Amino acid sequence: MSAPHNVLTKKNPRRGRFAFPRRRVRAGSIDEVVQLLRLPANIANGIHTRHKKCWNDFRGGGGGGGGSRVDGTRAFVDLYGLGYLCNRTNSTLADYLCTLFVAEAYRDACCAQPPAPFPDYNASPPDCRPPLPPQPPCKPNDSELLDRIVRQNDLILNGLNQLCLNHSNHHFELSNILNSIKLQNVNIINQLSQIFDDGVLSGLDEKLSRLIADLDGHFADFGSALDAALAQLQDSLRNDLTNINSILANLTSSLTNINSTINNLLQTLQNLGLGEVGAKLNDVQSTVDRILGVLTPEIVAAAAAAAAKRAH
């Protein structure tokens, strides 16, 4: 496969900023790469400016003549910029462009030639000019080096393909999630529209106001009934407590009267002299016993035996 001829590249023979030896930095046209890969025109805005050059930059470095017909504002990118652009699509053409770019850079490094000097318009006559030094011959291509480069490029391309695949998978997952969210939003909007169309929410304020008014009326009635029940309960408790106090007062007075009666009875018994009456009764009983012993001794003996048994 040959390189596409419409991919314009330019060599920059300037020395690197890190004091590397003189080398040629290859750059590719942004417009033609974007056109080949069918990318949007503004995708190059994501490339840092240090990886982009214009035609005037190459001319300032001695890479082009004053009679070039190429547009001076035309932009170019280095290997990093080309990799950035090729990573935005998943195609064999992007892989081929990266491989061709690296291969040409290695080939130029192997076959490096000093840049052609600018013509000296104030030079001396031809007889007085010193002879030009001979140009070194181009080194032959080293197949082993190229094979190694090919393997490295394959590894790089495999990594880029894997990154592109992962990016595509993540993009697909995010797209599915966004689509599901959009579908849910559409369903919710449709349901809300259906609710508003059916007029379900039209009389909701009135219904809620009526319900609140009914609840307020029920709560007021319940409060009144509860207050009446509590007042009635208080009256009943008050009456019951009054009756209990009356009963306790009556009991207290009755106990006081009973106590007074008992005291009076005790006083009366003390005044009667029961001790003398008992002594007189004992005398009468002893007299009767003597009479009975004289008249009926058997009865007296039986009574004495019964008394002895009771004593045992």
From Swiss-Prot:
<comment type="similarity">
    <text>Belongs to the baculoviridae PE family.</text>
</comment>
<dbReference type="GO" id="GO:0019031">
    <property type="term" value="C:viral envelope"/>
</dbReference>
<dbReference type="Pfam" id="PF04513">
    <property type="entry name" value="Baculo_PEP_C"/>
</dbReference>
<dbReference type="InterPro" id="IPR007601">
    <property type="entry name" value="Baculo_PEP_C"/>
</dbReference>
<keyword id="KW-0261">Viral envelope protein</keyword>
<keyword id="KW-0842">Viral occlusion body</keyword>
<protein>
    <recommendedName>
        <fullName>Polyhedral envelope protein</fullName>
    </recommendedName>
</protein>
<dbReference type="GO" id="GO:0039679">
    <property type="term" value="C:viral occlusion body"/>
</dbReference>
<keyword id="KW-0946">Virion</keyword>
<dbReference type="GO" id="GO:0005198">
    <property type="term" value="F:structural molecule activity"/>
</dbReference>
<dbReference type="GO" id="GO:0055036">
    <property type="term" value="C:virion membrane"/>
</dbReference>
<dbReference type="GO" id="GO:0016020">
    <property type="term" value="C:membrane"/>
</dbReference>
<comment type="function">
    <text>Major component of the polyhedra envelope.</text>
</comment>
<dbReference type="GO" id="GO:0019028">
    <property type="term" value="C:viral capsid"/>
</dbReference>
<keyword id="KW-0472">Membrane</keyword>
